[in-house]
Swiss-Prot record:
Pfam name, any one: Dus
GO molecular function annotations of the record: flavin adenine dinucleotide binding; mRNA dihydrouridine synthase activity; RNA binding; tRNA-dihydrouridine47 synthase activity; zinc ion binding
Species of origin: Chaetomium globosum (strain ATCC 6205 / CBS 148.51 / DSM 1962 / NBRC 6347 / NRRL 1970) (Soil fungus)
C3H1-type zinc finger segments: 125-149, 170-191
Keywords, comma-separated and alphabetical: Cytoplasm, Flavoprotein, FMN, Metal-binding, mRNA processing, NAD, NADP, Nucleus, Oxidoreductase, Repeat, tRNA processing, Zinc, Zinc-finger
Protein name per the record: tRNA-dihydrouridine(47) synthase [NAD(P)(+)]
Function: Catalyzes the synthesis of dihydrouridine, a modified base found in the D-loop of most tRNAs. Specifically modifies U47 in cytoplasmic tRNAs. Catalyzes the synthesis of dihydrouridine in some mRNAs, thereby affecting their translation.
Reaction catalysed by this enzyme: 5,6-dihydrouridine(47) in tRNA + NAD(+) = uridine(47) in tRNA + NADH + H(+); 5,6-dihydrouridine(47) in tRNA + NADP(+) = uridine(47) in tRNA + NADPH + H(+); a 5,6-dihydrouridine in mRNA + NAD(+) = a uridine in mRNA + NADH + H(+); a 5,6-dihydrouridine in mRNA + NADP(+) = a uridine in mRNA + NADPH + H(+)
InterPro entries: Aldolase_TIM, DUS-like_FMN-bd, tRNA_hU_synthase_CS
Gene (UniProt): DUS3
Binding of FMN, residues: 309-311, 384, 456, 497, 554-556, 578-579
Ranges annotated as biased composition (Acidic residues): 72-81
């Protein structure tokens, strides 16, 4: 369902950029006059094609005016992959193998992506990586150590020369007065010195705080990134892997759950041939060993636009950029529950947040009264996990609640469409397992302490069988067997993506269905209160937010006009924005200001520079950190290139699912940003990160855009 007509909504002017075509002045250039035509004009646009003004088209209308099929396919596959590690294409699932192997190899997704190796030519020993030249720490390997201990040789032969971007000065050291990368920093000459001793010797030293070696060597250095919170020490992760971290609540709850599940199965097996009497089950029912703790109250409202959890692209630097531009709620990338319990570094790294994410979200005290909500204790950052069994979800939730001091909520992913996740029983596989999902939510709620539990779902696992309406009832009230015995499951909020698992991004999100679910949830919230009043006194521990379950919509939101249309007409509490933020991160700023913002190419370049700076702060300014930053910048640019400046459009609002014909920008930089050629993305990265090293590879999520740098010679 397309969003309703937005031309009737009151419009404001944007920084001299009128979004209704009228500002009382003719002094603005034509490119700055943004016009909204009548609905009939908007309907006349070619389906799926962005309406670029004729003067910016590279080809006359009708001649190569539409994006190619491979370009659209690449975009759609990248959109699927933003929710997971891989996703099948229609060709892979419906067609027989092609005889032309070469052509086949260039289609679909890169399911086993490689990014090459990018390390120093010779490794510097940790014992000298942060110390003065003459004062290394003792090396436990002694003469058997195969790393370099000669600092001067390392600086001359063991690594690349310093890069010259940012004036040759280390951005991390310039901001914080220290650089966790130490001698490995590729800007190290900006924070090192050579001092003369009385005996005539010259010693290389790091300047100021950069000379302080972290306890524990390289691993510890990775744990002290400036401005980063929710850092779990290496020792704790090791203890998790050895099952030395007590998860007592989980053990007690899971033991009860196993008995109850067995008892329930036996009851229904006994009565499978006749009508079951629920009173038989209730008579033998044993309550859980403990009640959930009372939860910290949540709040979602029209002033709290939400950044969706995004695999790969939803990394810390990108979230930090979006928060700076107005995002009020953020989520970690989806972490897998079992690797978290195994203490795997990669999944625990996803739980790190920037200090800007642990401040309270925006809250309008003049709005509706939210009983019990304390904005001063709220934070923006939440964690999202995927699990295929109650024991995984419950234990992972208790571990997160124990070990992460800054956590708004724990969200259970029930919508990931990726084959590998689905076949494991996680993600969107839970859309067809309502009973298991309820047990998971109840268990997570029981062990999470004061941290609320939420869920993200889709309309269903396949077209023609939409299950979200039944599922939201289950999440709001619980099954009929349990709702009047132990109350609601305790789900504080549900986010609904307006697509099924099998529906790809060629179709618009169904906001009509989202609106129907929003109306149901309003009824369920009222019914929950009625049940509490008529059956027994309300149990605050099973009624999140005092009985109100928040409902968020997700899908295709790309402007403030669409955002407020969904809040006002679909009646969702807030809107979660995913692809729209990847293409246009300042969509949150537009929502805050209530107007379109025609960002210039220089402003967009500033956002790229900020991403690079934030990447070096998060991952380091050494060879490894710079190329992590480069890799994730290229991932970001694979979406960023889709933005069509609104000054180039004939009509508004812009549509996220429309692809532009070939066009030129208002300047060379704007034209460069519009390129879908990976070589141009590399050029943009080199503006800030210097030339890519010989071992660097970049494989986008679609095979038609791969890059592998070749070593000279």
């Amino acid at each position: 369902m397309e969003p309703q007509d937005r031309t009737k909504r009151p419009q404001e002017e944007d920084n001299g950029v009128p979004i209704d075509g009228h500002n009382g002045s003719n002094s603005e250039p034509a490119a700055k006059k943004i016009k909204l035509d009548s609905p009939s004009s908007a309907d006349s646009r070619a389906k799926g094609v962005a309406p670029i003004k004729a003067e910016y088209l590279l080809f006359p209308p009708g001649q190569k005016a539409k994006p190619t099929q491979s370009e659209a396919e690449a975009d759609d596959n990248d959109d699927d992959a933003a929710e997971g590690r891989t996703a099948p294409t229609p060709q892979e699932t419906q067609q027989a193998p092609q005889k032309d192997g070469k052509r086949k190899s260039q289609r679909g997704q890169n399911k086993e992506r490689e990014f090459g190796t990018f390390s120093d030519a010779q490794r510097l020993c940790n014992t000298i990586a942060w110390t003065p030249e003459f004062s290394p720490r003792p090396c436990k390997h002694g003469d058997r150590c195969n790393a370099l201990h000669d600092l001067r040789k390392y600086l001359k032969e063991g690594r690349r020369p310093d890069i010259t971007t940012f004036g040759g000065k280390c951005p991390v050291w310039e901001k914080y007065g220290k650089c966790p990368s130490g001698w490995r920093c590729l800007f190290v000459h900006s924070h090192m010195d050579e001092i003369k001793h009385e005996d005539g010797r010259s010693e290389l030293v790091l300047v100021g705080d950069a000379s302080k070696a972290p306890e524990g060597g390289e691993e510890a250095a990775g744990e002290i990134k400036p401005g980063v919170v929710n850092m779990v020490p290496v020792g704790i992760k090791y203890d998790l892997s050895k099952k030395r971290i007590p998860l007592e609540k989980s053990e007690q709850y899971l033991a009860w759950l196993a008995k109850d599940t067995k008892h329930l199965a036996k009851h229904y097996q006994k009565h499978k041939d006749d009508e079951t009497n629920p009173n038989d089950y209730r008579a033998q029912y044993v309550e859980p060993p403990f009640k959930p703790s009372e939860k910290r109250r949540l709040y979602f409202g029209r002033e709290t636009p939400v950044l969706a959890p995004l695999t790969t692209q939803g990394n810390l630097p990108f979230r930090r950029l979006c928060v700076e531009l107005g995002a009020q709620v953020t989520y970690s990338e989806m972490a897998l529950g079992l690797p978290l319990l195994q203490g795997l570094k990669a999944d625990w790294t996803l739980m790190r947040a920037h200090e800007s994410e642990i401040v309270p979200p925006r809250f309008n005290p003049g709005g509706p009264i939210v009983q019990g909500y304390d904005n001063s204790k709220d934070v923006k950052f939440g964690a999202q996990i995927a699990a295929n069994a109650p024991w995984v979800a419950v234990k992972a939730t208790e571990a997160l609640s124990q070990l992460l001091p800054h956590l708004r909520l724990v969200d259970l992913n029930c919508g990931c469409p990726v084959d590998a996740v689905f076949k494991s029983g996680s993600g969107s596989a839970l859309l067809d397992s309502h009973s298991k999902l309820e047990r998971m939510i109840r268990g997570m709620n029981a062990v999470s302490g004061e941290v609320p539990i939420t869920a993200k779902i889709r309309m269903g696992s396949r077209d023609g069988k939409l299950t979200a309406q039944k599922l939201v009832e289950r999440l709001a009230l619980g099954s009929e067997d349990l709702r009047d015995m132990i109350g609601a499951p305790g789900c504080a909020a549900v986010t609904l993506h307006g697509r099924t698992r099998l529906q790809r991004y060629t179709k618009a999100a169904d906001w009509g269905y989202i609106a129907e679910c929003a109306a149901l949830i309003k009824q369920f919230n009222e019914k929950s209160n009625d049940l509490a009043d008529t059956i027994r006194e309300a149990d605050e521990n099973t009624l999140p937010n005092g009985g109100k379950m928040y409902f968020l919509g997700n899908g295709d939101c790309y402007s403030h006009v669409e955002y407020f249309d969904h809040v006002d007409n679909a009646k969702v509490d807030s809107v979660m924005i995913g692809r729209g933020a990847l293409v246009k991160p300042w969509v949150f700023e537009e929502i805050e200001k209530g107007q379109y913002l025609d960002k210039s190419s220089s402003e967009r370049l500033t956002y790229i520079e900020k991403f690079v700076r934030y990447g070096m702060e998060a991952w380091g300014s050494d060879e490894l950190g710079l190329n992590y930053t480069r890799r994730f910048l290229l991932e970001f640019l694979s979406f960023f290139c889709r933005y069509v400046p609104i000054g180039l459009l004939e009509r508004l609002p812009p549509n996220l699912n429309e692809r532009p014909p070939a066009y030129r920008g208002r300047d060379d930089l704007e034209t460069l940003f519009a390129s879908k050629n990976y070589k141009d993305w590399i050029k943009i990265s080199e503006m800030f990160l210097g030339p890519a090293p010989p071992g660097f590879k970049f494989q986008p999520k679609h095979k038609s855009n791969s890059y592998e740098i070749e070593a000279e010679g």
